[in-house]
Amino acid sequence: MEKPKIQEVIAVEGRYDKNALLQVVDASVLELGGFGIFNDREKTALLRRLAETRGIILFTDPDGAGFVIRNRLKGAIPTGRVLHAYVPDVYGKEKRKRRAGKEGKLGVEGMPPEVLLSALRAAGATFEGEGATVKENPVTHADLLDLGLIGAGSRTKRAALLRALALPEHLSTAALLDVLGTLTTREELVEECNKIVANRE
């Protein structure tokens, strides 16, 4: 089976993440070297250039460290096309490791191929030979407020939504809004929230 080809460059934390992705897609994958990216000015400059020319997809682990790396890079790459791919919170350990990570979550390398592909599609990756899909009625900040996903008393409902959409728990409001913009429409989000409310009753 031929692997789908992606236009953007995918930036991952390490070599095992890179290997996992290259088994699923035909793409340029750049290793960040974990926290080492913070001191690597040349690689950061390369990421800026790639964001301007081809676009990049930040694909870090769903743990706290992955979000620190993602957020630091988001600030370091102010312009260009920067997409964010997320894998769900799945607890366990990768086969090559003796024990689970600090938070006990699987990283990019531990995810099944279909989860990786789904995360890339949800991020808005450009797949060669496929037309771009534009969602009508995108989700807005006001929608999140109206649906009780942000603001006072929103924690439980928001956590349930993140689980239902297979998104990591560390997602900020801005990141959630970005993801929902490519993943769902306003109507689909309302429907999902209604299911969550029905399941709690």
Locations of regions flagged by a protein language model:
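Short Gly/Thr/Asp-enriched flexible loops that form oxyanion-binding sites at enzyme active sites
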Residues: 68-76
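Acidic beta-strand-to-loop metal/phosphate-binding motif
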Residues: 11-13, 51-65, 86
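A short, flexible N-terminal coil/short beta segment enriched in small residues
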Residues: 1-10
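Acidic, metal-coordinating catalytic cores used for nucleic-acid/nucleotide bond scission
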Residues: 36-39, 59-69
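C-terminal, charge/polar-rich interaction regions
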Residues: 118-121, 125, 130-201
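Short, ordered loop/turn segments at secondary-structure junctions
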Residues: 16, 33-35, 61-63, 85-92
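Long, charge-dense
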Residues: 75-126
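Acidic, glycine-rich catalytic loops of TOPRIM or P-loop NTPase phosphate-binding modules used
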Residues: 8-9, 15-19, 23-53
